[in-house]
């Protein structure tokens, strides 16, 4: 079996993680005590991907829950699925990282790291054939960003050939929780570029927009936002958990989605997004799903894909649908919007189809796009970073934990390089490259 170990770190990571386990448990018909109450053998066939079978037929999530303060852990534990997790897998400090990346990465977080890695090892050892790791965290705070990236580098060190997927909540342009967000995010992206295989960039503002404009929720809560994220997370791994006509796994995704190793930052989307009240009145067609999935309003990162070009994309459909129709629709969308796809990467959309739809829907689709417009997101953070760093504002909090200013400069230039790499491939065309070849031949 292809198992996945989920590590959730920091307040945001744990809240998303908790929501995700609710969604997954519901799909596999597992109740809050870890017992199975379903009627379909499909639910149990590959349940090992996310669950360990314990004595007495209980199913225990392969989750590692980490935080530097006990608060969030307590609320997860007292939440609806709090009793499912293995008690030893809760690892928390007492003092918090106080929104300080350096505390999470170098001091407080580093002290806790050994015990976190012990639990990760234990989980990895109980797998037959470990496919990889998923990490949920935010990049704006201290624990998820600082300690999350430290954990990432440690996992990369011990399991160099396993896929690491991160679901990273980026700071949003209008909604900011903390002043030092740009610092924390830039330092984290610096690490993600080097150590992650796939990073799903999600930001709260895009989620708020989806909730208020598309789902018509008057006052969206974090619970609603996290529900959207967990729908995407469940969609990405659905092919591993249920049988399908065309399968995808984390590695296949990475191979098809990442044309150059540094450019692994994706925008996720999900369809159908309909308000909770109007769900039962609509029967979706594959055409509508495809249309909605590629719509800019459905993107969970606050960037407009129409400002860039798709280097690659993946679409994971769920539900019973004719393959032929899926292929036709995917071809149509690329044909009609060909200017938005990089012409020097032919057939750059990967499709997967899984037969089992999520609860309450006949069919759904998860979209993952590697679009050059994601640079807008990094540009925004970078501008805020530069504005503060030029005045050396708040730096003493970081240098006080033993950090060096050089690290900030390195992180800044790495992120700017990333932006210019995206820009370079956005402008590239197929013709240009042929010309270059001719030019080289003439010189020779």
Swiss-Prot record:
Report the GO terms under cellular component.
Answer: cytoplasm; extracellular exosome; intercellular bridge; meiotic spindle; microtubule; microtubule cytoskeleton; mitotic spindle
Q: Reproduce the UniProt comment on modification after translation.
A: Some glutamate residues at the C-terminus are polyglutamylated, resulting in polyglutamate chains on the gamma-carboxyl group. Polyglutamylation plays a key role in microtubule severing by spastin (SPAST). SPAST preferentially recognizes and acts on microtubules decorated with short polyglutamate tails: severing activity by SPAST increases as the number of glutamates per tubulin rises from one to eight, but decreases beyond this glutamylation threshold. Glutamylation is also involved in cilia motility. Some glutamate residues at the C-terminus are monoglycylated but not polyglycylated due to the absence of functional TTLL10 in human. Monoglycylation is mainly limited to tubulin incorporated into cilia and flagella axonemes, which is required for their stability and maintenance. Flagella glycylation controls sperm motility. Both polyglutamylation and monoglycylation can coexist on the same protein on adjacent residues, and lowering glycylation levels increases polyglutamylation, and reciprocally.
Extract the GO molecular function terms from the UniProt entry. GTP binding; GTPase activity; metal ion binding; structural constituent of cytoskeleton
Name the residues that bind GTP.
11, 69, 138, 142-144, 204, 226
Which residues are annotated as modified residue Phosphoserine in the UniProt record? Answer: 172
* Gene3D superfamilies the UniProt entry points to: Helix hairpin bin, Tubulin/FtsZ, C-terminal domain, Tubulin/FtsZ, GTPase domain
> What spans are recorded as compositionally biased (Acidic residues)?
429-444
Q: What is the effect of changing residue 320 to H?
A: In OZEMA2; loss of function in meiotic spindle assembly and oocyte maturation; when expressed in mouse oocytes it leads to abnormal spindle structure and maturation arrest
Which cofactor(s) are needed, names only? Mg(2+)
Query: Which effect does the record note for changing residue 417 to N?
Result: In OZEMA2; loss of function in oocyte maturation; loss of function in meiotic spindle assembly; decreased alpha/beta-tubulin heterodimer assembly
Disordered: region residues: 423-444
Please tell me where Mg(2+) binds in this chain.
Answer: 69
Per the Swiss-Prot or TrEMBL record, what residue ranges does the short sequence motif MREI motif cover?
1-4
Keyword list (alphabetical) reads: Cytoplasm, Cytoskeleton, Disease variant, GTP-binding, Isopeptide bond, Magnesium, Metal-binding, Microtubule, Nucleotide-binding, Phosphoprotein
Domains (record comment): The MREI motif is common among all beta-tubulin isoforms and may be critical for tubulin autoregulation.
Task: Relate the protein's function as given in its record.
Answer: Tubulin is the major constituent of microtubules, a cylinder consisting of laterally associated linear protofilaments composed of alpha- and beta-tubulin heterodimers. Microtubules grow by the addition of GTP-tubulin dimers to the microtubule end, where a stabilizing cap forms. Below the cap, tubulin dimers are in GDP-bound state, owing to GTPase activity of alpha-tubulin. TUBB8 has a key role in meiotic spindle assembly and oocyte maturation.
The record's subunit annotation is:
Dimer of alpha and beta chains. A typical microtubule is a hollow water-filled tube with an outer diameter of 25 nm and an inner diameter of 15 nM. Alpha-beta heterodimers associate head-to-tail to form protofilaments running lengthwise along the microtubule wall with the beta-tubulin subunit facing the microtubule plus end conferring a structural polarity. Microtubules usually have 13 protofilaments but different protofilament numbers can be found in some organisms and specialized cells.
Which protein, by its recorded name, is this?
A: Tubulin beta-8 chain
The gene name reads TUBB8
């Amino acid at each position: 079996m292809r198992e996945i170990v989920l590590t959730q770190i920091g307040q945001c990571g744990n809240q998303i993680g908790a929501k995700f386990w609710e969604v997954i448990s519901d799909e596999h018909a597992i109740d809050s005590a870890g017992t199975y109450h379903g009627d379909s053998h499909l639910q149990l066939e590959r349940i090992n991907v996310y669950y360990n079978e314990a004595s007495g037929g209980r199913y225990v999530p392969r989750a590692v829950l980490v935080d530097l303060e006990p608060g969030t852990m307590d609320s997860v534990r007292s939440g609806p699925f709090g009793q499912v997790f293995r008690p030893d897998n809760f690892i928390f400090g007492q003092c918090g990282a106080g929104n300080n990346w350096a505390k999470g990465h170098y001091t407080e977080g580093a002290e806790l790291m050994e015990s976190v890695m012990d639990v990760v090892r234990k989980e990895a050892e109980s797998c037959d054939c470990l496919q990889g790791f998923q990490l949920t965290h935010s990049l704006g705070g201290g624990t998820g960003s600082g300690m999350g990236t430290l954990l990432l580098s440690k996992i990369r060190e011990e399991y160099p050939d396993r896929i690491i997927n991160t679901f990273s909540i980026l700071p949003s342009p209008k909604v900011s929780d903390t002043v030092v967000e740009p610092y924390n995010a830039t330092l984290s992206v610096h690490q993600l570029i080097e150590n992650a295989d796939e990073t799903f960039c999600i930001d709260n503002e895009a989620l708020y927009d989806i909730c208020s404009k598309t789902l018509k929720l008057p006052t969206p809560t974090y619970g609603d936002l996290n529900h959207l994220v967990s729908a995407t997370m469940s969609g990405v791994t659905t092919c591993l958990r249920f049988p399908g006509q065309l399968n995808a796994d984390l590695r296949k995704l990475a191979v098809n989605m990442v044309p150059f190793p540094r450019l692994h930052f994706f925008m996720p989307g999900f369809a159908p997004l309909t308000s909770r009240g109007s769900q039962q009145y609509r029967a979706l067609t594959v055409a509508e799903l495809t249309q909605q999935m590629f719509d800019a309003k459905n993107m969970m990162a606050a960037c407009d894909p129409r400002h860039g070009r798709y280097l690659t994309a993946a679409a994971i459909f769920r539900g019973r649908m004719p393959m032929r129709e899926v292929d036709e629709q995917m071809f149509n969308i690329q044909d009609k919007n060909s200017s938005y796809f990089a012409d020097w990467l032919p057939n750059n959309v990967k499709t997967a189809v899984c037969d089992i739809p999520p609860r309450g829907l006949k069919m759904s689709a998860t979209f993952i796009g590697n679009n050059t417009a994601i640079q807008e997101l990094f540009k925004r953070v970078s501008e805020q970073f530069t504005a503060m760093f030029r005045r050396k504002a708040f730096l003493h909090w970081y240098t006080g934990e033993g950090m060096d200013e050089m690290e900030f400069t390195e992180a800044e230039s790495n992120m700017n390089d990333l932006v210019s790499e995206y820009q370079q491939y956005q402008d590239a065309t197929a013709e240009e490259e042929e010309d270059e070849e001719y030019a080289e031949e003439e010189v020779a």
